[in-house]
């Protein structure tokens, strides 16, 4: 099956993408652009010559190739981003019938499909936060923003968490009430948000169109009257769909964030839970979300459409920032008023930074595992570990689940603190034992990072996140090249062990 990556790669040449094939199946490639093709492409735009048989045949052949390429590309998008994302890409990105599938169109359609499918590596995770927004197009179409905190990690569905923050005015706003502070209300779910973002007139036309198509399908086109034929042409656009209660709604742009701590992929429950080092603080976000809802009930908080603190976008951003978004990307407030577009852009920036750090962390893990493929490096690492009596068992999962006693948790924290001190002393001794001209650049960078970023049990989530990002990026840079010696490989493994200690302290910090 041809995938999206094949189209992206073929489009890089700048030529239009075509789909050919042989007995082995379809093949994506860049169209040939020789002298003959250039000549016919030029003649197809000359008024006096474009109707010549040869030119017309060439133009029709190109249109057919473009249509086939588009069909296969939309199918590939559907496989990767789902039918809704592929439909959106076709509706908004295909534009003209028979237009070439070039680099710009491929990039735009992939971007649109990603937008409707949702952005972020955390989408399949059991513990995640979803930032949703509907585009703002002015005061008449202000859009909306909301945020959902989900935790489906427990096997018992009754213990799952679904906290939705959606800030609305408690009454319909008039044209002169955009600056007024009025009573707010909060909606309890994404489905209600979707219904609220589609107008009554649009919903009526969608129902009439659906009914007309059903009648024409049942009775036959020739028995349909003019009104039914007209109504049947009104199809739902990308994002407009019926929910399970047969109500029309408009889907949002979605940005997914992971929660810090142990997590797993809902699609593969057989895989062991893994610790997510970079993410948002679920407990802190839940506390703030519930504070917001209590403020709405008590009257302490109000709604004001044009505001930097009291509209839907600012409230969604407030909860996002409570989870530690600013540990990854500094937040800059809007000049006059927050809006869903500005909020969406900030959410995307935070998501991109979090995903990049987690990908780098996973890459560091894989590369350090490869270092242990060497028997001599394994032996050196075993000797180093045994010298400190280091324990490989993490505190994190037991602490996060509340299954370890306070005494046991403290004992493990003390053990991790001793190991941090030992690794730090190892790098300090290494740094002091070499003169400037004999020091390896990678060793010097790692020693400096160890000195600045050694974790402790007193660190909060913000400090641990900052230290972890420095260590992961420093170690990641120097793992790109193979270590020149076993001793250099040992130092990289010691730095990797320090990242493991940060994970242990992070687990304790978020469980506190």
Curated annotation (Swiss-Prot):
<protein>
    <recommendedName>
        <fullName>Effector protein BopA</fullName>
    </recommendedName>
</protein>
<keyword id="KW-0964">Secreted</keyword>
<dbReference type="InterPro" id="IPR011070">
    <property type="entry name" value="Globular_prot_asu/bsu"/>
</dbReference>
<keyword id="KW-0175">Coiled coil</keyword>
<dbReference type="Pfam" id="PF09119">
    <property type="entry name" value="SicP-binding"/>
</dbReference>
<comment type="function">
    <text>Plays a role in mediating bacterial evasion from the host autophagic pathway.</text>
</comment>
<dbReference type="InterPro" id="IPR015203">
    <property type="entry name" value="SptP_N"/>
</dbReference>
<keyword id="KW-0843">Virulence</keyword>
<dbReference type="InterPro" id="IPR044899">
    <property type="entry name" value="SptP_N_sf"/>
</dbReference>
<dbReference type="GO" id="GO:0005615">
    <property type="term" value="C:extracellular space"/>
</dbReference>
<comment type="similarity">
    <text>Belongs to the BopA/IcsB family.</text>
</comment>
<feature type="coiled-coil region">
    <location>
        <begin position="347"/>
        <end position="377"/>
    </location>
</feature>
């Amino acid at each position: 099956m041809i995938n999206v990556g094949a189209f992206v790669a073929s489009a890089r040449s700048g030529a239009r993408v075509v789909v050919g094939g042989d007995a082995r199946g379809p093949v994506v490639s860049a169209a040939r652009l020789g002298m003959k093709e250039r000549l016919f492409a030029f003649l197809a735009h000359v008024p006096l010559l474009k109707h010549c048989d040869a030119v017309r045949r060439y133009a029709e052949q190109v249109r057919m190739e473009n249509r086939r390429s588009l069909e296969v590309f939309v199918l590939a998008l559907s496989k990767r981003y789902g039918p809704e994302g592929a439909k959106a890409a076709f509706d908004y990105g295909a534009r003209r019938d028979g237009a070439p599938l070039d680099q710009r169109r491929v990039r735009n359609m992939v971007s649109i499909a990603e937008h409707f499918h949702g952005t972020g590596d955390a989408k399949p995770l059991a513990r995640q936060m979803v930032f949703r927004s509907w585009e703002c197009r002015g005061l008449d179409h202000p859009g909306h923003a909301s945020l959902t905190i989900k935790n489906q990690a427990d096997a018992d569905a009754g213990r799952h968490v679904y906290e939705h923050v959606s800030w609305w005015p408690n009454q319909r706003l008039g044209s002169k009430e955009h600056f007024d502070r009025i009573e707010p209300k909060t909606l309890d779910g994404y489905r209600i948000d979707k219904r609220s973002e589609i107008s009554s007139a649009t919903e009526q036309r969608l129902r009439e169109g659906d009914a007309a198509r059903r009648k024409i399908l049942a009775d036959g086109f020739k028995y349909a009257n003019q009104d039914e034929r007209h109504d049947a042409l009104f199809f739902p656009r990308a994002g407009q769909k019926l929910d399970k209660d047969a109500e029309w709604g408009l889907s949002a742009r979605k940005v997914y964030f992971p929660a810090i701590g142990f997590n797993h992929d809902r699609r593969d429950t057989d895989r062991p839970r893994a610790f997510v080092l970079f993410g948002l603080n679920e407990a802190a976000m839940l506390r703030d979300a519930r504070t917001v809802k209590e403020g709405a009930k008590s009257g302490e908080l109000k709604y004001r459409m044009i505001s930097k603190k009291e509209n839907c976008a600012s409230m969604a951003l407030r909860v996002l920032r409570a989870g530690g978004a600013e540990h990854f990307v500094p937040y800059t407030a809007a000049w006059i008023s927050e809006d869903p577009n500005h909020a969406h852009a900030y959410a995307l920036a935070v998501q991109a930074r979090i995903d990049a750090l987690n990908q780098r962390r996973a890459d560091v893990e894989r590369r350090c595992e490869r270092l242990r493929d060497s028997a001599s490096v394994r032996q050196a690492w075993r000797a180093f570990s045994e010298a400190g009596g280091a324990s490989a068992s993490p505190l994190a999962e037991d602490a996060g689940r509340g299954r370890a006693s306070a005494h046991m948790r403290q004992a493990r924290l003390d053990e991790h603190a001793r190991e941090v001190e030992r690794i730090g002393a190892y790098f300090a001794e290494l740094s002091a034992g070499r003169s400037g001209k004999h020091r390896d650049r990678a060793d010097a960078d790692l020693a400096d990072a160890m000195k600045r970023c050694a974790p402790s049990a007193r660190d909060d989530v913000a400090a641990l996140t900052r230290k972890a990002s420095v260590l992961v990026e420093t170690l990641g840079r120097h793992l790109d090249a193979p270590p020149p010696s076993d001793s250099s490989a040992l130092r990289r493994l010691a730095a990797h062990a320090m990242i493991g200690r940060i994970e242990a302290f992070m687990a304790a910090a978020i469980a506190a």
